[in-house]
Amino acid sequence: MEIKPLGDRVLLKPMEEEEKTKSGIVIPDTAKEKPQKGKVLAVGTGRTLDNGTRVPLEVQVGDIVVFSKYAGTEVKVDGEEYLIVSERDILAVVGHEN
């Protein structure tokens, strides 16, 4: 199933953090924080201004982004977990993957 975000929404695949600390201690699932980094899989058509002009989104498919801790809506499709967030909840682009 294809997910196409609408307007200024962005579809992300959350990236899990390391399972171990640098010193080798394994972090149990109960102590893990919610991911705040993800890969952009799809973007909406952009934000519409009051005068009807459409402003394209700044992020692109393939960008690795950092987003607000409690941002977006989690969705599960075909056993995979995704996050749909508004572009304003994305704090920074930290890389790009193809």
From Swiss-Prot:
PROSITE patterns in UniProt: CHAPERONINS_CPN10
GO terms for MF: ATP binding; metal ion binding; protein folding chaperone; protein-folding chaperone binding; unfolded protein binding
Matches recorded under CDD domains: cpn10
A GO biological-process term: chaperone cofactor-dependent protein refolding
InterPro entries: Chaperonin_GroES, Chaperonin_GroES_sf, Chaprnonin_Cpn10_CS, GroES-like_sf
A cellular component term, taken from the record's GO annotations: cytoplasm
Record key words, sorted: Chaperone, Cytoplasm
Matching Gene3D superfamilies: GroES chaperonin (2.30.33.40)
Localization per record: Cytoplasm
Principal location listed in the UniProt entry: cytoplasm
Record-stated family: Belongs to the GroES chaperonin family.
Function, in words: Together with the chaperonin GroEL, plays an essential role in assisting protein folding. The GroEL-GroES system forms a nano-cage that allows encapsulation of the non-native substrate proteins and provides a physical environment optimized to promote and accelerate protein folding. GroES binds to the apical surface of the GroEL ring, thereby capping the opening of the GroEL channel.
NCBIfam families found in the cross-reference section: PRK00364.1-2 (NF001527), PRK00364.1-6 (NF001530), PRK00364.2-2 (NF001531), PRK00364.2-4 (NF001533), PRK00364.2-5 (NF001534)
Subunit-structure text: Heptamer of 7 subunits arranged in a ring. Interacts with the chaperonin GroEL.
Name listed for the protein in its UniProt record: Co-chaperonin GroES
